[in-house]
C-alpha cells in the first residue's frame, strides 16, 4: 500500500513540476528527435489514417479547443475525487494539530488504516461543493445559513452511519450545551456555516482552477489511481472495524481472511489507530 502511495505522490509532483516548467513541450521535442519518436509518429499517423477512413468527420482537437475543454471542467467526478483527496488530507492534518494543541498529546485522526486521510472531511468537502455551488454568487449570509444546516445534518448522519454499520462512535458531544443527541451541536453547526462561506467563496474556486491545469491524460490516470487506492483502503478499513467488534463475542477466526485481520489489525492496533473510538456493541 505504501508503495502505491509513493508512486501516486511521485506522479502527482511530477504533474505539478510539468505545469510549472513546461516540461511536456520539452519532452515532446526530445521525442521528436529520437528514433523511437519517429517510429511512434509513424504508428500514430497510421492509426489516425484508419480512424479518418472509419469516421470521415473526425479531426484533432486544436490548442484553442484544448483550452476550452480542460481536464475536470466544472463540477464533475474527476474534480470531486481530487476535492475529496485534498480535503481528506488537509482535514486530517488540521484536526491532528488542533487536538494536539487542545489535549496536549498527539493522536491519529485518520479514518482509514493507511495514510493521513479523514473521510469525514473529504466527503464533507464534496457535499458542500455539490450542494452549495448554486449559491456561490449569492450573499455570504445565504451560504452561511445553508452550510449551517447542511454541515450539521451531515455530521449527525455520519455519526448515525458509523454506529449502525460498524457499532462505533467516533465523537460524542453529550457534555456540550445545545447538542443534538451528542452527534452534533450548535457551535459546530456555526463552524460549518463559516467553513461553507470560506470554502465556496475562496478555497474551492482556487482549487478548481488548479485541478483544471492538470494535463488531461495524466489527470485521468491519477484520478483512477486515487479511486482504486482509496476504495481498497476503505474496504480494508471496514473489514478491520467489523472484525474488531465481532472479536469480543467470537474470538476465533472463521476463515483465513479473519486470521489475517486478527494478525495485522488486532485490538491494540485498532485502539492506537482510533483512540477516541467507542465500540457500542462491545459495551453491550
List the model feature ranges, each with a label.
Residues 1-284:
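Aromatic-rich, lipid-facing transmembrane alpha helices and their immediate juxtamembrane interface loops
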